[in-house]
């Protein structure tokens, strides 16, 4: 159906009344990533796509956006067979994609970012005034309020996401794919995004909403498709879905989504920060006079939008970043700027944010990574010189069994494991030392819902054993589910602290943006 025959969207572009993917197959060496998957999106609906890591979501959407090409199957737009060869081809067919990590140039303005890669209406001369005017028109239509003349670096995260949506609409997207669109947003920004998505759907756009947050899927979508192991499990109306039902469809078994925590049995202070300051990687203020106390037997959650000092906080405590002012004490001993080895020796363990950079050596085996920090311990060596490989393998096998790590053997290279199993290995190693203080930074980022459930249970068990746990996470659901207290960071400072007892999500959201 031609654009002149088809109904137009408010943006003046042709509507995609229906898009259907039938029998889609995609093979990679040794892997069947998509196994005869059927998926469709209709005009005016928000269709959620759920599944664990490796379930096939990204592969399916990359084929729809022209990044991959299906080995078998068919894509039809408005009942017409369509071959999508590249992202440019996808855009020409009215398909846009909003990536989880924004594809924007920070030093350029909003208008310049939107104009990138597009032909000017004036030949070799820039037409940024035309682009800016069109951006303002789209902003008014969809309530995407952004100043086209501002550079990207001056915009908040939620505003940058609006720029991505505006860019897709400017290029004529009738169908939008949104990959984890709420991952870095505050609750208020999520509410604003959902209003925009509902308006887009009401105006005739089709939307694919990829998320791991089940409550958001239930709130925003009309239908839900669940993938598992490269196959479609089912597609159901959202009105017939519940969180437990969706989780079971994703994993193939019942999943515990809410935890009954034992009453808090807090002990003495184990970790204390007093007016700690530090520089960021850019040489600017990373931490600004942060004070915090953490007692044994409690979990303190650190909430905040990414980039507000959380990484610097974890690194200052664990000896990986210089403290420029203030002090850090563990069990009453001043450990300010102590090396990591000294901190390990006094019972501090660390689950790092970047597991593949700071947590493991991917070219090493599972067993070698398990004893990475303790390989010189007397239980693994003779006279601290000769390594006892049999004892190392035995200890690693016990950890594999206890922490349900899926690996062919202790000699398997870590790079061959899934993200969830690598995270379990890091957790097993850090807990094997029976720590008094545990710093857990983004412990379930990029991890399947089944592995997330397991890691959460382990953290709660450590809490009950008396371990003092600092949980740093950008996932408010995780923070609220596990924490006894919640501190909020903004621009390198702790701007508020609340007891996690029927905590007000709106209050947390305001604190995360520097409000009161």
Question: Residues of each region from the PLM?
Answer:
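Glycine-rich phosphate-binding loops of nucleotide-dependent enzymes
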Residues: 2-516
